[in-house]
Each structure stands twice: as C-alpha cells, then as structure tokens.
Curated annotation (Swiss-Prot):
Record Pfam families: Fer4_7 (PF12838)
An annotated GO cellular component: plasma membrane
Record's protein name: NADH-quinone oxidoreductase subunit I
Localisation per UniProt entry: Cell inner membrane
GO biological process, one term: aerobic respiration
Family from the record: Belongs to the complex I 23 kDa subunit family.
Membrane topology type: Peripheral membrane protein
Database matches in Gene3D superfamilies: 3.30.70.3270
Cofactor(s) this protein requires: [4Fe-4S] cluster
InterPro entries referenced in this protein's UniProt entry, alphabetically: 4Fe4S_Fe-S-bd, 4Fe4S_Fe_S_CS, NADH_quinone_OxRdtase_chainI
Source organism (scientific name): Pseudomonas syringae pv. tomato (strain ATCC BAA-871 / DC3000)
Quaternary context: NDH-1 is composed of 13 different subunits. Subunits NuoA, H, J, K, L, M, N constitute the membrane sector of the complex.
UniProt-listed Enzyme Commission number(s): 7.1.1.-
Record's catalysed reaction(s): a quinone + NADH + 5 H(+)(in) = a quinol + NAD(+) + 4 H(+)(out)
Amino acid sequence: MFKYIGDIVKGTGTQLRSMVMVFGHGFRKRDTLQYPEEQVYLPPRYRGRIVLTRDPDGEERCVACNLCAVACPVGCISLQKAETEDGRWYPDFFRINFSRCIFCGLCEEACPTTAIQLTPDFEMADFKRQDLVYEKEDLLISGPGKNPDYNFYRVAGMAIGGKPKGAAQNEAEPINVKSLLP
C-alpha cells in the first residue's frame, strides 16, 4: 500500500513540475521570429546568393578563367570566354543554376579577381526550376562588393595598347623565366 502512495506522490510531483515549466515558458523570450516582419540576424560570414562584381572603373571583374566552374563540387556554374579588342577576357555568358548550388563558397575562394562574391541574401524561392537559373545580367551588381579598391588588371600588369609589358611609366620589365633555368 505504501508503494501505491509513493507512486501517487511521484506522479503528482511530475505533473506539478511540468505545469511549472509550461507556465515559466509563457514569460520567456520567444525563440521563433515572425519572419518577414522581424528580420533574421545573419552572421557576417553568412554565405548566401552569389553575385558578380565590377572593378572600380565600372568594368566587369570576371576574366572568364573558368576556375569557379572547376572548383564547384556540383557543377552548377557554366561560362564561355570572349575577348575584347585590347586582349581583355570577359565571359560571353555566365550562368549559375541555383537549384543545384549548395552555397559552399568554393567558387568565391577560387576566383583570382574577386569577381564572385557571396552575399547575405537568402530569399531566392521560386515556383519553377528554370527561374532559378541566373544569367550574367541577373548576377552583375553595380558596385565593387567587398573589395572596393581591387582592380585585377592593375595588379596583373596587363600591357597597355601599343606598348609591350614593362614599357609603361613606373613599371618593371617582365622577367624572362627561361633565363632563370640552369
């Protein structure tokens, strides 16, 4: 009989403890957000939508080197190289299939010109899969993104039209690598 009384006391204690816990949660700060009205906090290094940036001169930064497409583990990036009259490469078309993209950031790390950057934008839901395939016009933004002063062609030392490399003002002569061989 004492066993039954002990079970009743134990059950009553369990019920009271549960009621106190439920009552206490009514006065706590809620964990859920009323999303679109309340914006979600995203950490600074959040990897969201991919964009193509421009250099400080307003030209496309992408040189169509194809490193981003090679680095992509799911193969969602495709592009075709074209060349301007002065020898500068640019992508004739640049396409990202966001229905396959896993937002790993490997394309951003592989890009030598910092043309590809991941933004904290994550609202890309759509009803049709073909609407998740973004072309170059959809990806290009007007600004330089995270690196505002970087210009690949200034750093890489591209030849000026009509002058060989090393002939510009304050520019060192190019090194002949074959002369360094034994």
